[in-house]
């Protein structure tokens, strides 16, 4: 199997603090680049854990369609600004950030006060504009999670009336593109592939760390497949039908046939279903007439038994 390597050939940090990394992975056998590219892209875009603002409390506001006196933006605009805030929480617990600002002021993300567990990535992101003589008091809830978590309206009845929930986007990777270069040729003349991946993150994680974390998740996913355990399937006994549970007495057999069967420990139709016609003839004092009688009784309830043991 080919030993390939991964090289980061470019790294950029944009004005909004998002980061772009370009990686080359190769040489790879034909088809492996597509396998790697698709697998990594799926995990990068939806499987990495990230941080997001999940709720906002604004002093004096109890619903999202309100306005805040002395603040240029309405509540919906403030919530949108908070939702787009890029944060990185190192805590698995709920973290709360607060700010109290008196106008005139341009409130930005840097004005929020969090614990040392939370880093604000885009500190210059605007939150609101407060006019002179007015103030704004905010509380932001930050949590860690995976993927996208919409507001659960079912829980609103148990949530504080002034806590405005936000659809949370926990995905730290914003974009993943990959292309496959098939021009690299080995010494033996066989065509090899090289995977080129472009990864853009929101700045809460570097592209290098994102690739490493995605690769580790894939390793954990596939590792159990390296040791396949053989499990013998135990055949399950079929559930007895209603007819099979009919007691022998309800077949209305003659006294002779009934007594012979009882002495042979036959107590129900289920027991009879284990017999063939030849088996019935071997029961002591059980002749062909009695055997025919049993066959007819079983056929009346839709059950038949084989003529011989070999056809059973």
Swiss-Prot record:
NCBIfam families: PRK05182.2-2 (NF003516), PRK05182.2-5 (NF003519), rpoA (TIGR02027). The N-terminal domain is essential for RNAP assembly and basal transcription, whereas the C-terminal domain is involved in interaction with transcriptional regulators and with upstream promoter elements. DNA-dependent RNA polymerase catalyzes the transcription of DNA into RNA using the four ribonucleoside triphosphates as substrates. Its EC number is 2.7.7.6. The gene is rpoA. The lineage of its organism: Bacteria, Bacillati, Cyanobacteriota, Cyanophyceae, Synechococcales. It catalyses: RNA(n) + a ribonucleoside 5'-triphosphate = RNA(n+1) + diphosphate. Residues 246-312 are annotated as: Alpha C-terminal domain (alpha-CTD). In cyanobacteria the RNAP catalytic core is composed of 2 alpha, 1 beta, 1 beta', 1 gamma and 1 omega subunit. When a sigma factor is associated with the core the holoenzyme is formed, which can initiate transcription. This is DNA-directed RNA polymerase subunit alpha. One of its GO terms (cellular component) is cytoplasm. GO terms for biological process: DNA-templated transcription. Belongs to the RNA polymerase alpha chain family. Keywords: DNA-directed RNA polymerase, Nucleotidyltransferase, Transcription, Transferase.
